Every structure is written in C-alpha cells, then in structure tokens.
Amino acid sequence: MLHAAQIAGAGSPYVVVIGNEKGGSGKTTLAMHLAVALLKEGQRVGTIDLDSNQRGLTRYIENRRIWANHRRIELEMPLHHLVLRAEGAKLRDNEAKELAAFEGIISGIRKSVDFLVIDTPSTDAYLMRLAHLVADTVLTPVTDSFLDLGTLASVDPVTHEVTGTGHYAEMVCEARMRRRQFDQGHIDWIVIRNRSARGQLVGHSITELGIRLGLRDVEGCAERIVYRQFFPSGLTALDALDEATFGAIPGQSHRLAQQEMRILIGFLNLPIGERGRRRAAARKEWYASAQAPLEIDKVLID
C-alpha cells in the first residue's frame, strides 16, 4: 500500500489543502472555486472531502451535477471522493482505517489528476493532520474578525500585536517540519483574508503573523451574499455568466465576484502547466463548434 509520506512524491498530483479549525470561514466555497478554476485551465482535478459529517464539498459537487443535467449544459466536474471518518471504539484502529481509505483513494487517482484539492473539517482530527502533512500548498481562509483569528494567533487587545501562536497554526508548523524531515519538501502556506470594511486591524495582525511563521498573506474576496447563493445549484463565480447557466440573468454582484475570484486564484501562483492550457483551449473550441449552428452547405445534399 502507498505510504502517506509518498503521496507528495515525484509523479504525484500537486496537493492543495483548504484548512482552518474555525467553521464558517469559507473553506468549502474556496475549495469548489479552486477546483473549477483549475478545470477551466485544462488541469485534471481530483477533490477529496474529509468532512464526512457536513459533507459540504460532496453536496456542492452533487448539486452541480444535478443542475447541469437539469439545465442541459456542460459544467466542468472534478473526480471526487469522500473519506468517511472511522467510528470504532479504539483510536489506533480508527486511524489505521482512515489512513488506508485515504491512501487507497490517492493510489487510485494519483496518475489521473494534475491537482488534488482537499477540503478538511473544522476540527483537529487525524485525517485533518494527514492532509496537511502531504500538502504542497495550504490555503487558510479567515474572515476579518479577531474571533476567527484565534485559531492562528493570540492578539493583544490594546496594541493588536501578535502575542502567541494559535492551535491550528501550530499544527501547520508541525506538518511543515515533518514534511522537511522525510522529503525536504516545502509547504506553501497562504492565509486568505476575506475582506470587510472593519478588517484593517486584523490584516495588520495577519501580516505580522506571516513574518513570524513564514506564511503568505493575500487579500481574498468580499463578503458577498452571492457566494452563498451558488451552493444550491453547484455553480461558482467562475462559470459562464449567462442565463443558460444560471437560469436567470446574472447581476453586477456576480460579475464582481468573478473578477475578484480570478484575481485571488492568480495570487496563489499554482504550477499550472502549458499542456493543461492547450487542453482547455481545445475543449473551448470544441464546445463552441458544438453549439454553433450548422452551415447551410453542410446540411443540404445535392
């Protein structure tokens, strides 16, 4: 069986883990948008949902499949898997089962995908730590709130200076250290701050934390209701902004969401290959020709 430490080895997909112990930070929304963005770039994408209780990413993808069939449209779909949490009486047995399930999925798809996007639960669990250990990039979305920042750092209430490292940040640092030990790999950790009008002080604290821990701090998306409206239909801000796709004419909020999401994905600097871009261009050309009406000389027969 493939050992977990080999998942990130040569010939394996580039692994992006979406993680934060704070619920409601937008992990699943980010995971879905990233997967669709990579698919639109012609990359072969696998997704794994490690939150077997909420199953947010699993339901998001299933909604997308149902919506595409209902609207009779083509929507990019990742190769998706759900890892169930073991519920036995013995912790060691549970971890062995979860490791086997995780490794089994990776073994089955590692040669079929270029990227693997993993959505994690908002709890410190074995699967959560395992995913971070094999990550090439960790994305941590946070809202502009000192309450949400608590999983990353403790902050002085007067000066807003960082005074300590939070539990989740310690877990990521441990994963980075262990990763260096077994394959000299580097985990690129990016904290994505979702923007609000009140978040300037939070931004300063995250920047200070970045200097301490060697993480990248990028500005994310605004808090828009439209992101929550995407879930029932499985759509994203990166899908075609037309009535055929959405079932209604998209508004200005859709266009703004698309623009800011494209900017965010660009900031991540993921290794998107030229081969994938050529694949995306060919797919786009094929789809355009399939939708175009036939020329009259191709219809009439002498």
Regions from the PLM with identified roles:
Residues 1-10, 180-302:
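C-terminal lobe/tail of nucleotide-utilizing enzymes
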Residues 15, 19-25, 37-116, 122, ...:
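P-loop/Walker-type NTP enzyme "switch/lid" segment
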Residues 30:
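Hydrophobic positions on the alpha1 helix immediately C-terminal to the Walker A/P-loop
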Residues 33, 37, 130:
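Active-site signature of alpha/beta-hydrolase-fold catalytic machinery across serine-
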Residues 41, 118-219:
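Conserved catalytic-core segment of NTP-binding enzymes
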Residues 55, 147-149, 228:
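Generic structural signal for helix capping and beta-alpha/helix-loop junctions
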Residues 58-61, 151-154, 203-204, 230-234:
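Short aromatic-enriched loop/helix-cap "lid" or pocket-rim segments at secondary-structure transitions
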Residues 63-67, 157-159, 236-238:
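Short, hinge-like loop/turn segments at secondary-structure boundaries
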